């Protein structure tokens, strides 16, 4: 059972800060007016890494809760971003680029699910 221990709060906070910074950099470098490659990249990489962490945590029940909280809830929660994805999709819809919005939404959702599943399956089959 998780508790509201100070170490858990610190783990989430540090992880979230690092994840958000890492999400910000590809957004600066890769996001363009037509397609937000930086956000898509962050979400796909984050989805894959969440799968990795789910498999690693499942195979190491002795790990303390703060490790999962720092890595998954904090870092990967800060790296991946449903709110930015949603805002970018709505912006595309408002600009009338419906096919681009649909493609971006589909690529983000299907890609993130595929990356998470790929990582989880690969590690669990070891």
From Swiss-Prot:
Signal sequence residues: none
Pfam families in the record: CRCB (PF02537)
Binding-site residues, Na(+): 77, 80
Reactions listed under catalytic activity: fluoride(in) = fluoride(out)
GO biological process, one term: cellular detoxification of fluoride
Topology with respect to the bilayer: Multi-pass membrane protein
Main location: membrane
Cellular compartments per GO CC: plasma membrane
InterPro entries, alphabetized: FluC (IPR003691)
Transmembrane segments: 2-22, 37-57, 65-85, 101-121
Keyword Transport: yes
Gene Ontology molecular function, alphabetical: fluoride channel activity; metal ion binding
Keyword tags: Cell inner membrane, Cell membrane, Ion channel, Ion transport, Membrane, Metal-binding, Sodium, Transmembrane, Transmembrane helix, Transport
Activity-regulation annotation: Na(+) is not transported, but it plays an essential structural role and its presence is essential for fluoride channel function.
Any coiled-coil regions, as ranges: none
Cellular location(s): Cell inner membrane
Protein task: Fluoride-specific ion channel. Important for reducing fluoride concentration in the cell, thus reducing its toxicity.
Family: Belongs to the fluoride channel Fluc/FEX (TC 1.A.43) family.
Protein name (Swiss-Prot/TrEMBL): Fluoride-specific ion channel FluC
């Amino acid at each position: 059972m998780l508790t509201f221990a100070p170490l858990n709060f610190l783990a989430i906070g540090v992880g979230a800060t690092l994840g958000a910074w890492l999400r910000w950099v590809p957004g600066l470098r890769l996001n363009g007016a037509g397609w937000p490659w930086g956000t898509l990249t962050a979400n796909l990489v984050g989805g894959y890494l969440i799968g990795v962490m789910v498999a690693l945590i499942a195979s190491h029940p002795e790990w303390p809760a703060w490790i999962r909280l720092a890595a998954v809830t904090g870092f990967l929660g800060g790296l991946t971003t449903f709110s930015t994805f949603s805002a970018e999709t709505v912006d595309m819809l408002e600009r009338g680029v419906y096919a681009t919005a649909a493609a971006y939404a589909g690529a983000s959702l299907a890609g993130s699910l595929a990356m998470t599943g790929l990582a989880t399956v690969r590690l669990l089959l070891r």
